[in-house]
Amino acid sequence: MTKRRVVVGMSGGVDSSVTAWLLKEQGYDVVGLFMKNWEDDDDGEYCSTRQDWIDVVSVADLIGIDVEAVNFAAEYKDRVFAEFLREYSAGRTPNPDVLCNAEIKFKAFLDHAMSLDAEMIATGHYARVRERDGRFELLKAFDHTKDQSYFLHRLNQAQLSKTMFPLGEIPKTKVREIAAQIGLPNAKKKDSTGICFIGERPFRDFLNRYLPTKPGPMKTPDGKVIGEHIGLAFYTFGQRKGIGLGGSKDGSGEPWFVAAKDIASNTLYVVQGHDHPWLLSRQLVAGNVSWVAGEPPADGFSCGAKTRYRQADAACSFGRADGERFSLAFDDAQWAVTPGQSAVLYDGEICLGGGIIEFAATGQPGQTAPAPAAGHTGALAEAR
C-alpha cells in the first residue's frame, strides 16, 4: 500500500520538527521542506538562516525523512515585503505574517509541495482544520494561549483542503515534552518572535534601511507642540515606549501614547493616559476582505473579533458594506484599534475570516470616515 505523502514546512524550530515526527509516526511518507525567504544579511547577528537549516537537517536525520531547501526570496519581496513598505509609507501598521501565510507558506510553498507529488502539506501552526458538509473550517487551537488562527484567516477553501495542523490539539507544553523525549537536537530552542523571516533585529533600525526619516512635530490634542518625531512610519497607535517623552513634565504626569497621525501635515499626535478617548473605538471599517468559506457572514451577525493577536474575542455585530469592505460595531470600546492590522472574526471556535482595518472611530474630533455599512450609523456617522 502506497503511503500518503505529506510535505512539512520545517523552520528549524521545535513546532515544525515535532509536526514532522508525529506524521512519520502516523505512517505518512513525510518530506521536509525548508523555506529561505530572505536574502539580505544572512551573515548578520539577527538572521539565523544557516543555523536553522543545520537544525532542519539534524532533525530530518534523526527521524528518518528526506528534506530539501527552496528559495522563495523573490516571491516574498514581491508579494509581502513590497506591500509591507507601502503600508508603512502610508502611515499604517501592517502585519506581514498574515500576508506571508496567505502568499508564501500556503501558496508558493503549497504549489512547490504539489510538484513533489504531495497529497497534503503540514506546518507547525497552532490551529485546526475541520471538514463539515463538504466545506473546510478553520478552528482555533485547543491551546488558546498559542492559537494562531488570527494569522491564518486569509486561507481559502483550496488551501485548507490540502493542509494539516497536527499541533492543533496538543498543548505547547506537551510539544516541548515530545521534543525532549525523542531527543530532538533543537528541543530547547526558543520560539521565534521577530517579523516573519526577517528575524529579531531592532525593528526601527531595520525599517530605517528602507524608509527615509521625515521628522515632524509631535503634538497634544489641543495642538501644543511637545516634541519632534523622526517619521510617522516609525510609530504605531497605542505605542508607549520609544516616543521620547518619558521625562516630559507636561500634562498630567500619566504615560504618553501615540494616538493619531496626520499624513498631510506630517504630525504625530500623542495623548496621556491609557484610557484617553482618542485611544478608544467602538466601530471600525475594514477592507481587503477574505472569508474562509468564500462568503461573508449575514448583515447584523453577532460574532467575536480580534483587532490584534492574543486579544480576547470582543463581542460585536457585523455590517456588510460592499464586496471589499465591512464594518464592526463593538459592545465595548476597544483600545488602540490600528489601521493596517487585521480585524479577524470568530463564531465561537470557528475563524470566519476578516479584513485589513482602514478606519476606527475614536474620540478624536474631525475624523473622516468611510461610509458605514448598513445599520452601523452611530460613531462612524458622527465622525464624518
From Swiss-Prot:
Its EC number is 2.8.1.13. Pfam families: tRNA_Me_trans, tRNA_Me_trans_C, tRNA_Me_trans_M. ATP binds at residues 9-16, 35, 124. Residues 146-148, 308-309 are annotated as: Interaction with tRNA. GO terms for cellular component: cytoplasm. GO terms for molecular function: ATP binding; tRNA binding; tRNA-uridine 2-sulfurtransferase activity. It comes from Burkholderia ambifaria (strain ATCC BAA-244 / DSM 16087 / CCUG 44356 / LMG 19182 / AMMD) (Burkholderia cepacia (strain AMMD)). This is tRNA-specific 2-thiouridylase MnmA. Keywords: ATP-binding, Cytoplasm, Disulfide bond, Nucleotide-binding, RNA-binding, Transferase, tRNA processing, tRNA-binding. CDD domains: MnmA_TRMU-like. The keyword Glycoprotein does not apply. Signal peptide: none annotated. Belongs to the MnmA/TRMU family. Disulfide bonds join 100-196. It catalyses: S-sulfanyl-L-cysteinyl-[protein] + uridine(34) in tRNA + AH2 + ATP = 2-thiouridine(34) in tRNA + L-cysteinyl-[protein] + A + AMP + diphosphate + H(+). GO terms for biological process: tRNA wobble position uridine thiolation. The record marks 125, 341 as: Interaction with tRNA. The active site is at residues 100, 196. InterPro entries: MnmA-like, MnmA-like_C, MnmA-like_central, MnmA-like_central_sf, Rossmann-like_a/b/a_fold. Catalyzes the 2-thiolation of uridine at the wobble position (U34) of tRNA, leading to the formation of s(2)U34. It is found in: Cytoplasm. The keyword Membrane does not apply. Residues 95-97 are annotated as: Interaction with target base in tRNA.
